[in-house]
């Protein structure tokens, strides 16, 4: 069982690295410029990869554009992954905005505000 989990983690890390690379080198869509893949969570049977990303902008419109751009590029990304990875079947990709960094920044700001008041 531990071996299976190790493989799932390894595949997730590999997909994260490759998708970042593909976004930089192969996807020409301006909507995905500035997108960074932060984490990939694999389903146990490796059929689905949840791909979490961040974007430099805080604007909701930019976030929506990035999401749309990623969804449009999914076919290209999967095709490129197929060339790079030695897997029988490339998992389906679902892109989700990673809000953990923004959440962390908000907590930092709240702590600074508290610190300034004391």
UniProtKB/Swiss-Prot annotation:
The record, for Gene3D superfamilies, names: 3.30.300.20
What coarse category fits the chief subcellular location reported for this protein? cytoplasm
Localization annotation: Cytoplasm
- Any keyword Cytoplasm? yes
**Domain of life the protein comes from:** Bacteria
Q: Name one Pfam family in it.
A: RBFA
Arranged from A to Z, the UniProt key words for this protein are: Cytoplasm, Ribosome biogenesis
Biological process according to GO:
maturation of SSU-rRNA
What does UniProt give as GO cellular component? cytosol
Q: Name one GO molecular function term.
A: ribosomal small subunit binding
Q: What does this protein do?
A: One of several proteins that assist in the late maturation steps of the functional core of the 30S ribosomal subunit. Associates with free 30S ribosomal subunits (but not with 30S subunits that are part of 70S ribosomes or polysomes). Required for efficient processing of 16S rRNA. May interact with the 5'-terminal helix region of 16S rRNA.
Q: Provide the family line.
A: Belongs to the RbfA family.
Summary of subunit composition and partner proteins: Monomer. Binds 30S ribosomal subunits, but not 50S ribosomal subunits or 70S ribosomes.
Q: What HAMAP family has UniProt attached to this entry?
A: RbfA (MF_00003)
This one is known as Ribosome-binding factor A
Lineage of the native species? Bacteria, Bacillati, Bacillota, Bacilli, Lactobacillales
Q: Which gene encodes it?
A: rbfA
């Amino acid at each position: 069982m531990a071996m299976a989990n190790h493989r799932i983690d390894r595949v997730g890390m590999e997909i994260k690295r490759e998708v970042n690379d593909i976004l930089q080198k192969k996807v020409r869509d301006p909507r995905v410029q500035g997108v960074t893949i932060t984490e990939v969570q694999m389903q146990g049977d490796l059929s689905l990869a949840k791909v979490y990303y961040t974007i430099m902008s805080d604007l909701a419109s930019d976030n929506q554009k990035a999401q749309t751009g990623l969804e449009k590029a999914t076919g290209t990304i999967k095709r490129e992954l197929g060339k790079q990875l030695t897997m029988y079947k490339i998992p389906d990709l679902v892109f989700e905005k990673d809000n953990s960094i923004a959440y962390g920044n908000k907590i930092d700001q709240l702590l600074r505000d508290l610190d300034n008041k004391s």
